[in-house]
Each structure stands twice: as structure tokens, then as C-alpha cells.
Amino acid sequence: NHKLGWRGTTNTLLNFGEGKYPVDGKAGAIGYLVGSPGKGLACMFHMMNEARIGVGTAATMLGMAGYHASLEYAKNRPQGRPVGPEGKDAAKPQVRIIEHADVRRMLLAQKSYAEGALALELYCARLVDEQKTGDEKAADEARILLEVLTPIAKSWPSEWCLEANSLAIQVHGGYGYTRD
């Protein structure tokens, strides 16, 4: 499994029936009942909730990394001449691309996506803590909020921090995803 940009995360591929140890001499897998009959999926989702928040946090950090890399690049990359009342002056030194309006727009969009995602992830993490350590009323309120926010905490950063990194690639001149 070679996911670009996702180094250091715990993920794996599961194959059922292709293993070294067949069941009763045939391809297959041994299954175990999780929870009560008909309730296993609910148990699995309960178990996976914190992992789903973790996936959203990983996407958030990738978006943050892309933003900070493109911000640093934009602060240092010269391109174009300053525009004055009489147009561009070729005799003047080049300006950094952070001074270009469209580059600035892309940087601000990246920052808003990444910081918005971070705020959501930190809020969900606080709710997880509240659910485990708060009094009964606070824990129940946190549980209810997490039921709604957990899928969002995974999907929203995954979608919008990818968009932030698409903008980061544009700020870098469209080089794409490269390794030095």
C-alpha cells in the first residue's frame, strides 16, 4: 500500500480467504460475533469514531503543511514587476508572488480551509474528552454532538484540505506532487 503523503499512519489492506491458513481446507476467514446479533455494525462504528476523527486530523495536518509550504514559497519567489500608475516598470526589481492578488487569494483560501478543519477537529477532540470525563449530563450532550459531528470531522477536512493542497500546488507553479 503506497499512499502518497500518508506516511506514518496506521492503515492496512485486509484480504479474506487468500491467507496462509484456510478454514476447513478451503479459502475463507473465521468470523467472530461483535455485540448482539444484528448490532455488530453499531458496535463497529462506535469503536471507529475516534479513528474517524484521527483521519480528519491527518487530512487537516496535510492541508496545514501544504499551506505553510506554499506561504513560505510565495514569500520568497520573485515574479513580475510592480504595477504603478503608469503600468509596469521593467527597471524596478521583481516582486514576490505573495504580492499578487490571486496568489494572496489562494493562500487565504488554504488558510481558511486548514484552520477551519483544525477548529472542527479540536472541538471533536474536546467532546471525546467530555464524553469520557464529564458529568452524566455533559457526557450525554457530548455523545449526541459527536454522533452528528464525527462523520463531518472525517469528510470535511478530507475534502477541503485536499482543495487547500490543490491551491498549494498552484502557488508552487503547478509542479504537482514531487519528491526532492
Indicate where each model-derived feature is located.
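Internal glycine-rich alpha/beta core junctions
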Residues: 1-180
